[in-house]
Amino acid sequence: ITLQENNGEKVVLDQKQSNSQILPKAIAAQSEKKELDYRQVVSTITQTHVLTIPRGENFKVVLCDGTEVWLNANTNFVYPTAFIGNERIVSLEGEAYFKVAKDAKRPFIVKTRTVQTRVLGTEFNIRSYTPEDTHVVLINGKVEVSNTQGGAFTRLYPGEDAHLQPDGNFILTE
């Protein structure tokens, strides 16, 4: 599992060593739990971090707003160390389960190569390893999905799975 910082420097997050000496002080690393926690980051300057989860591994990250993200194997996750502005935007290639902290004034947006998912506070799973196999499954709350080509947003309700089709439309199933 690697963490790449703004400057391109990569840090290997190793369960056998303490990562607290190699990561910025505000980020609490818990190697034995395979977790990074950004809730203590207080800054008006943000950095972009990239977590790469290899095959056979998984990892949890708690973003600065309290949103919890469980990353599955073969996943890249791009996120800011602090959310600044009117939106909370992250990018995903792979699969992750999100438990989004509620913030009615700042929607949380997950971008993949083919889908954009917009939420205000909810739990959902996104699988987007390839453009041909992109799914968004809603657990709780409400989300809206659209293709990245500017299509209209489609609202999901708990238990629904939105599967992106090659024509840019979604098939909804329960």
Label each PLM-derived region with a short phrase.
Residues 1-133, 144-169:
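Short acidic/polar, Gly/Pro-enriched loop/turn segments located at secondary-structure boundaries
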Residues 173-174:
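N-terminal periplasmic "start-of-domain" segments of outer-membrane beta-barrel proteins
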